[in-house]
Regions:
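C-terminal helical "lid" of AAA+/P-loop NTPase domains
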Residues: 176-180, 187-201
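Post-Walker A helix-loop "phosphate-sensing" segment adjacent to the P-loop in P-loop NTPases
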Residues: 62-73
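Conserved P-loop NTPase "ATPase switch" module shared by AAA+ and STAND
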Residues: 81-102, 106, 113-123
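Conserved C-terminal helix/linker of AAA+ ATPases
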Residues: 200-218
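Walker A/P-loop nucleotide-binding motif
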Residues: 41-57
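Conserved AAA+ ATPase "SRH/arginine-finger" region at the nucleotide-binding site
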Residues: 142-154
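Dynamic helix-loop-helix/coil hinge segments at AAA+ ATPase domain boundaries and subdomain interfaces
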Residues: 5-27
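Short regulatory helix/loop adjacent to the ATP-binding pocket of P-loop NTPases
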Residues: 125-140
Length: 228
């Protein structure tokens, strides 16, 4: 497909279960999503770094459960009854809930009615800065599973998928070149893909090792400027 045409298309990542890249760092999380509705207490906390795949797994679960996605900033005591009526709720940024009593009510109401709750956060519930004692005890008791940072194999696979989502093709030697040089994290992989996409579009050239070197240099410059 012509690159000019690709630039005019919206970027829509593949979010199906079959599109999720399973590896040692995330296989427990995948197993728990697949295990639904057999969740103890009807709730699960899924935590991991930005870009680790929490949102992808949540979308898989939402499609299966018919659940609703709520951001923690929108969770209020008055909104709880309406939210709980969905029967299955994904709470994004659950570690940043402003009204702790609202989350406590949501947990209790969903459990009472046989509903389900999937909490997404960067840290495990036991590490949240929770002030309400009753909520803290519920969170500590909640089944939780984390996604660790990727190994080299998954890091390369993640970059390939993100590039494919953007309709970009890249030789495997370029991926190997980058995996050996970028930080081993989902965030670094995502930033690299965005940088490569921008450079390839601006220079109207294929993704090569030369372009990858330029992307690495740009990322290093941004990092150095941020640190200074």
């Amino acid at each position: 497909m012509d690159r000019q045409l690709v630039l005019d298309l919206p970027h829509r990542p593949a979010q199906g279960r079959e599109d999720f890249l399973v590896a040692a760092c995330n296989e427990d999380a995948v197993s728990w999503i697949d295990r639904w509705p057999d969740w103890q207490g009807g709730s699960l906390a899924l935590y991991g770094a930005t870009g680790s795949g929490k949102s992808h797994l949540a979308e898989v679960w939402r499609a299966r459960s018919g659940g609703v996605l709520i951001d923690a900033s929108d969770l209020t005591v008055s909104a709880v009854p309406e939210i709980a009526r969905a029967g299955a709720v994904i709470l994004n940024h659950a570690d940043a809930v402003g009204e702790e009593v609202a989350l406590l009510h949501l947990i209790n109401l969903l459990r009472q009615d046989g509903g389900f709750l999937l909490c997404l956060s960067d840290e495990a519930p036991g590490r949240w800065n929770t002030q309400l004692a009753d909520l803290r005890s519920r969170l500590v008791a909640m089944q939780s599973v984390g996604i660790a940072e990727p190994d080299d194999h998954l890091l390369g696979a993640v970059m390939l998928k993100l590039l494919s989502d953007r309709q970009l093709r890249v030789p495997l030697e370029v991926i190997s070149f980058l995996v050996a040089r970028i930080e081993r994290s989902f965030a670094a992989a995502r930033t690299m893909v965005v940088t490569l996409d921008r450079l390839a579009a601006g220079e109207m050239r294929p993704l090569t090792i030369a372009l990858a070197r330029k992307a690495l240099a740009q990322m290093a410059e941004i990092s150095n400027n941020s640190a200074s």
